[in-house]
Amino acid sequence: MKQVNDFVHRFGHESFSDNRSVSVWFTDLDQQQTDMAQLSWLSTDEHAKAARLKNPLERQRYLAGRVFTRLILSEVTGIAPEKLEIIRNQCGKPCLSLPTVGRRLRSKRLLRFNVSHSENFLCIATALGCDVGIDIEVENPGLDILAISHTCLDQEDNERVQCSSLNERSLLFYQLWTRREAFAKMLGHGVDSDHVHRTSAPPWSLRSLELTLEEKQIVGSLAIATPTTASASHF
């Protein structure tokens, strides 16, 4: 894994004790080597979903992503990967059910996390004491942004894209789109939900992600329900 900035950590390098901290972890799924022992960590439902994927590459990436997710959550919590119980809340958002005592977590504290992937890249955002949502997209140079902007964005954001210069259009589109997705995932609602709206004084913050991995440009957004110590640029 690569350390991109203050809230993107190397695996096993940073402690996770500050309840205001948020970490984002990246990996290239095509470079992840999974063995039978690691695959045994996965739940029956995870194996069943993998079996339904007919495309071998998609299946390999899915399994690698599930193993990587458990590795990160195990590193953060100190709980063995095979003992982690990933559940879904009432809105269907994945979350981690923790025992009352963990090596790095005090009693009754719930770790929040969110996962996003694009092509062969996957990222995980982890946080304590606040909801978090993350979304990333690999930039597609051949995408007709003006043609699809009005179907993906609300009126105000679409107008910003339509009026943007050619040089800034692609980055702006992906920033706006991933921001909306990350916010929806933080809330646990769909991106078209009425809950996804603007407010001038939100009890949440948005951070931008821009990085290059394996010669690909990745744009993303991180939505955090409360102010954190994460160091990143704002939109």
What is the predicted function of each stretch?
Residues 1-235:
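Core catalytic alpha/beta fold that binds nucleotide/phospho-ligands
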